[in-house]
């Protein structure tokens, strides 16, 4: 085990504070409509230009281990806020810096760190209540577009595209962001349930122009095992042929004699049929088959529940208005499942999302909700260069998270105004002792900082604007883009309540930990003297890669 360096008290806290300031100062220049860009050097390729706070924070590593600890803790504030609300990372960083700077001053003056933390927590809890009280629901398309616009750094086309996507697939629908081909942003909507499995044989194709299988009002057979023996299916195929309707088979696999017979039947026009593999793997496959069954009003034919292929009747099959099967995708449109059953299934999956701790599982469950509830929209981002494309895609993803947060918890006036209004609720808040009161005052002063930073970045006088906004009421605030005092909500300058709340709570939580730090332990860096010469020899080999 390598030797460790330990620092205590004031010495440790000052080092940590230096790291906090370096990271926060780099991040906070991006805040507001007139926030500046930060250029990030990459070890390969062109540098990245960004106005996204969390992207800047993630790039920062400091050489001094103790300073780096401070920087990493603030980075944690940005990451937590990003994970919870998808935006507000810069606001959270500014708040954390303000609380740490003020808090460490108070500790240096001899205050009790634990009481300071209790005071800060008390003030934040009260402020959060006020944020919820002034929050308004975000239901109409216009408000959604405004939230998207603000989060995408005042890019109105992004806000409009997100609002349009939400309108088409519903607020529960899945909206994904991809890199497009042209210069313009575009929106593609896939209605119904789509899963990423295509036809098992190109001989099923009946629309040569689009190279797809198109089935109108088909029966849908769902089976959780492989189908290799056609004899098991003969009674069912005869029944389907008599009905004159097409058939879609979704099974673990269809192979050998069974697939060959289906292809021949299809080509001769005896039964219009297509076969695809079931989506997903393992338990997820079973769940997705069950989803399709509920959507189409069918039953999954599974030996686990005593059902076999030989005994299947037509009323155990699902039905839909239309099914299209391509090389890689299958889309079921307008399944004839019971609405109440679909809603119950969606509620069940939502409950699983709340219970799940894995981000990957949550994402997959959310996709299943969307496929059952509305559909999938894809926003394709257009840009002239690769660098611009990456930067824009980041912004669109941010804006998308922010709009989801707004739909979830509502909206508050933006531009730092909501926090200024929340200050009023803690003016009369009393701590149990003097040190707690100082903690409450620290939180109160910190809540002014997002507004101060937005105004400073816009090149105006922060103190003057702050006093003017404080003396205002309700939604009155400062539009940094135009330099005017306006009604923030009417002007479309709004933030999701969840973003502001998460930023404040996460900042206070991590800053509280820093204020109450008394010792720091870090490894002493090893001096690697012997290796430099060897590496010099290796350097010559770099030329080999250039040939």
UniProtKB/Swiss-Prot annotation:
Residues the record lists as binding ATP: 30-33, 51, 87-91, 415, 479-481, 495
GO molecular function: ATP binding; ATP-dependent protein folding chaperone; isomerase activity; unfolded protein binding
Keyword entries, A-Z: ATP-binding, Chaperone, Cytoplasm, Isomerase, Nucleotide-binding
CC annotations in GO: cytoplasm
Chief location: cytoplasm
Cell compartment(s), UniProt: Cytoplasm
Classification via SUPFAM superfamilies: GroEL apical domain-like (SSF52029), GroEL equatorial domain-like (SSF48592), GroEL-intermediate domain like (SSF54849)
InterPro entries: Chaperonin_Cpn60_CS (IPR018370), Cpn60/GroEL (IPR001844), Cpn60/GroEL/TCP-1 (IPR002423), GroEL-like_apical_dom_sf (IPR027409), GROEL-like_equatorial_sf (IPR027413), TCP-1-like_intermed_sf (IPR027410)
Superkingdom of the source species: Bacteria
EC number: 5.6.1.7
GO BP terms: protein refolding
Top-rank EC class of the record's enzyme: isomerase
Role played: Together with its co-chaperonin GroES, plays an essential role in assisting protein folding. The GroEL-GroES system forms a nano-cage that allows encapsulation of the non-native substrate proteins and provides a physical environment optimized to promote and accelerate protein folding.
Subunit composition and interactions: Forms a cylinder of 14 subunits composed of two heptameric rings stacked back-to-back. Interacts with the co-chaperonin GroES.
Protein name: Chaperonin GroEL
Organism: Dichelobacter nodosus (strain VCS1703A)
Gene name for this UniProt entry: groEL
